[in-house]
């Protein structure tokens, strides 16, 4: 027994001694990279270097200055001039020296946007860790170097909310003096929104240099930039599964990093009604998944403001007359009659596209009174609004045709049970709810958005829907139908959301049976990037339709999404959408790959759990991960 204990003690002593030596070695080892990078033919090439710290040329330095656009995302549309030199500085020496704007409210927004910008820069600085970082750069030299930012918004740029006609253009200049002691940044924009985008571009001209242990900024830059499309959106469904406010904030952070400007908030559906309304508390009481899974008024107001200072509008969708069910159970007990029909009806595939079923009872006049209250409160808590999404998706006519109250209503009006009769009834409903929706105090009459449907078909659209009142969001596959071309030819403004490229929930398997999801395979970032709205329009109409084609929107239905998977399913594919809609490049995805991979790194650095696209090795060894 004694010998056994001696052996154990010897082993333990050896382990402790080895650990002590290892700790001592790690404490003394500089952990500097043995590699440097050089820019060769617009590619950062990895090389071995000696131990001389003066030879260090870090990957971040190379990526900032290599190639015409460095690591800017989305790529600017007009002019990009980036020098091949950087200067180092301390974050405390980065300041907003001047913010010229026509009103105090715009100045306040500029200050908030600058604070967000500076916070994003700070996220790029790693936490101090003596095991891995040594203080290399001369702190006195850093303290002397200053970065001054001046922002000028034109006298006409009083807008503080985004509209379809808002000018989002900007001009950005970075100039460093001969002694590298002062870098002046000037931003000129017509509106706050353009200035905010310029700050995002500026943040992408700054990187942490691990070789120097310091922040660095490109010394000389000129950028002239404006978006190709007015509407650049993401649909977030928070009704199929509840998404927390914090997760929505991360989504908005990522959108801002990519200059996307519209969050389409699909906030209610048949499955749940998580929106608390003061005038109708029973809606969320009966319709939410739990008391903790509700968006109250302050939550909504917070999201709207959080989005606004990041250059994003929030467009709420109240889906009707389809996708309505939970939340409406109380109306019969209150003597208002049944307002939702076919709710949870079986077999569900007969009455709706997916379970649970449910549609509004458009034969019950009390329905309009409740809808008026819903619209008035939504208009208030989401204010200011210039756009409102009325839904109109996947209305099942068989549901109405098997509802006695609706069939009797048709008979009383002398109508039969034909498809045209139901479409007449549906279009009458749509006209009524549009007229009921209150005007906004700032923007006036709100323009409606509808999904493409039987009402928007080539034979019916101009009969039922006034193109001056409605924008049509076109889903479905462009390969299977000419919906977009037909709508454009009839003079409708269109938002493209074709399912064969921009439905990001596809490819994860069916959630009602085994096998593939009904919307097909996974849409990789390359397919998202290559989906050009102008090409779609040109193929179907012979024209790019620049006035009518407002832009596009990636869609994430959340039947298989919650907080845990949201970021990875949206990002970085949402970034591919962003460059398509901001820049609308003539080339395909391949020339964008290096910048795209870096943008994914940037999103992760900022706290967005964006999915991995390639091994880290590919990020460090550009253009070597390919298949020919």
Regions inferred by a protein language model and the residue ranges of each:
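Acidic, contiguous N-terminal accessory segments
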Residues: 2-230, 417, 436, 446-458, ...
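Active-site-proximal beta-strand/loop segments in catalytic clefts of secreted hydrolases
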Residues: 153-154, 189-190, 238, 267-268, ...
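Loop/turn elements at helix/coil->beta-strand transitions in domains of secreted/extracellular proteins
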Residues: 258-263, 309-313, 383-387, 441-448, ...
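Active-site neighborhood of glycoside hydrolase catalytic domains
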Residues: 351-471, 477-484
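Flexible, acidic glycine-rich loops studded with aromatic residues
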Residues: 447-628
């Amino acid at each position: 027994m004694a010998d056994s204990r001696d052996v154990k003690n010897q082993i333990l002593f050896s382990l402790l001694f080895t650990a002590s030596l290892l700790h001592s070695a790690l404490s003394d080892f500089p952990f500097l990279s043995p590699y440097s990078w050089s820019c060769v033919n617009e590619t950062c090439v990895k090389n071995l270097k000696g131990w001389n710290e003066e030879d260090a040329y870090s990957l971040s330095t190379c990526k900032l200055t290599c190639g015409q656009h460095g690591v800017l995302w989305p790529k600017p549309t007009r002019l990009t001039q980036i020098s091949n030199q950087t200067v180092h500085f301390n974050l405390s020496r980065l300041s907003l020296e001047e913010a010229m704007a026509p009103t105090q409210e715009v100045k306040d927004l500029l200050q908030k946007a600058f604070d967000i910008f500076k916070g994003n820069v700070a996220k790029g600085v790693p936490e101090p860790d003596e095991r891995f970082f040594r203080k290399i750069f001369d702190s006195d030299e850093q303290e002397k170097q200053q970065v001054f930012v001046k922002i000028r918004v034109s006298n006409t740029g009083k807008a503080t909310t985004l509209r379809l006609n808002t000018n989002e253009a900007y001009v950005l200049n970075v100039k460093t003096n001969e002694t590298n002691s002062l870098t002046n940044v000037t931003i000129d924009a017509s509106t706050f929104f353009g200035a905010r985008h310029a700050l995002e571009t500026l943040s992408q001209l700054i990187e942490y240099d691990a070789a120097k242990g310091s922040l660095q900024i490109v010394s000389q830059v000129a950028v002239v930039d404006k978006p190709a499309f007015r509407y650049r959106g993401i649909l977030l469904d928070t009704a199929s599964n509840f998404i927390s406010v914090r997760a929505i904030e991360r989504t908005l952070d990522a959108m801002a990093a990519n200059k996307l400007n519209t969050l389409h908030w699909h906030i209610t559906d048949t499955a749940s009604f998580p929106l608390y309304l003061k005038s109708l508390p029973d809606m969320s009481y009966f319709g939410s998944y739990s008391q903790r899974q509700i968006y109250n008024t302050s939550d909504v107001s917070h999201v709207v403001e959080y989005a606004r200072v990041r250059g994003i509008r929030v467009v709420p969708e109240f889906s009707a007359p389809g996708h309505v069910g939970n939340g409406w159970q109380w109306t019969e007990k209150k003597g208002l009659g049944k307002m939702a029909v076919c709710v949870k009806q079986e077999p569900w595939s007969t009455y709706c596209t997916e379970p649970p079923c449910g549609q509004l009872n458009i034969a019950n006049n009390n329905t309009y009174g409740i809808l008026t209250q819903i619209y008035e409160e939504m208009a208030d808590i989401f204010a200011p609004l210039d756009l409102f999404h009325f839904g109109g998706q996947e209305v099942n006519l068989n549901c109405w045709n098997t509802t006695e109250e609706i069939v009797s209503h048709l008979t009383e009006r002398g109508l039969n049970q034909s498809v045209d009769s139901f479409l007449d009834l549906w279009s009458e409903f749509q006209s009524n709810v549009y007229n009921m929706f209150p005007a906004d105090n700032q923007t006036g009459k709100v323009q409606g958005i509808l999904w493409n449907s039987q009402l928007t078909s080539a034979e019916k659209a101009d009969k039922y829907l006034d193109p001056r009142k409605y924008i049509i969001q076109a889903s479905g596959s462009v390969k299977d139908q000419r919906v977009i071309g037909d709508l454009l030819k009839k003079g409708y403004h269109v938002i493209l959301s074709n399912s064969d490229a921009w439905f990001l929930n596809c490819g994860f398997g069916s959630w009602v049976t085994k096998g593939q999801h009904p919307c097909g395979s996974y849409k990789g970032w390359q397919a998202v990037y290559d989906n050009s709205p102008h090409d779609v329009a040109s193929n179907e109409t012979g024209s790019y339709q620049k006035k009518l084609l407002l832009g596009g929107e990636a869609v994430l239905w959340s039947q298989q999404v919650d907080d845990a998977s949201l970021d990875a399913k949206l990002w970085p594919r949402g970034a591919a959408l962003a460059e398509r809609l901001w820049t609308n490049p003539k080339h395909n995805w391949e020339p964008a790959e290096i910048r795209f991979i870096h943008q994914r790194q940037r999103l992760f650095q900022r706290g967005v759990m964006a999915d991995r696209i390639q091994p880290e090795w590919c990020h460090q060894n550009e253009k070597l991960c390919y298949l020919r």
